[in-house]
Amino acid sequence: MNLTEDQFLEAELINFQLTMDNPDFVALAQEVSDYCKKFKPESVLDFGCGTGVYSEIFRREGYNITAQDKFKSHRDYCKEKHPLLKVYQKPREAALMLWIEVAEHMTDQEISKALEVVMPRIILFSSTPNKTEFDEDWGHINIKSENEWIDMFTDFGYELIEKPQTPTLWALTFQKI
């Protein structure tokens, strides 16, 4: 059973408390924002922005940030809770791409298409590294090991430059070669 997009949003809000009301999650988003400053990106895309917390923190820090999510319920939530954000269904070109816990929901073909559209110079990437009994419910269709992700991004013309351990212990930062 796959969660509907409304159930997915409800789980993020209630079960995981991925909101601006959760000081720990806000602090994590701030940590990610601080980490990304060294790249001096002209623009940032929060790809699969979910509840928009990363986007809102980046906006408050002065980044030129765009929030993107394919789910209408997530976009509507972001527009209501973060009215100053630019929120879109389709991705936009950006210098830095936040790709946090989204790729496991995508096929390799969708990943390739996203990279063609966004054309990021830097990618802060994190994707669930292990298979679980909950993958099907959460729509996890593409679980890869760290080395498999690194190989895939290498094939797309990126090199691994850091393992920042933020926002997750398995996060990776890639740079266009």
What are these regions (language model features)?
Residues 120-133:
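Conserved beta-strand signature within the Rossmann-like core of class I S-adenosyl-L-methionine
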